[in-house]
Amino acid sequence: MSTQIKSRQPFYWGILHGINDLVAGFLLAGYTLTHNYSDSFLFISLYAILGFGGQLPVGFWLDKKKEIRFFAKISLFLLPLSVLLFFVSAEAAIISSGMASAFVHVTGGTICLQ
């Protein structure tokens, strides 16, 4: 990979991070507008557990596997999958979005630290 492309990667992952947060906000807001309080609280909590708590196991996995490309592909697969799932099952979309968030944060952070 050329040095010029590699030097732009943190910028691209920063953009992806913003898109990831936008998608998560859209999914969670859409869910809370159409579901009761207890269901909304449950899925917001589940998103937070997966998205933030999931960063530690994903980080350990990335450290062990040492293949950033594999984790980048997972990130780029899960994020659009979350949007598509929203039209089938909002709950599945939120779960997918939480996992995508963990992968986006860990992979992007690793790329930025290189």
Task: Outline where the language-model segments fall.
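Cytoplasmic membrane-interface "Motif A"-like loop-to-helix N-cap segments
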Residues: 63-76
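Central cavity-lining transmembrane alpha-helices of secondary-active solute carriers
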Residues: 41-63
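Paired small-residue
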Residues: 92-97
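Transmembrane alpha-helix boundary/hinge residues in polytopic small-molecule transporters
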Residues: 26, 30, 57, 106-108
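C-terminal ends and interior cores of transmembrane alpha-helices
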Residues: 76-91
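Helix-loop boundary and gating motifs at the non-cytosolic
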Residues: 3-48
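Membrane-water interface at transmembrane helix exits
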Residues: 32, 59-63, 113
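Intracellular juxtamembrane helix-capping segments at the cytosolic ends
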Residues: 103-114
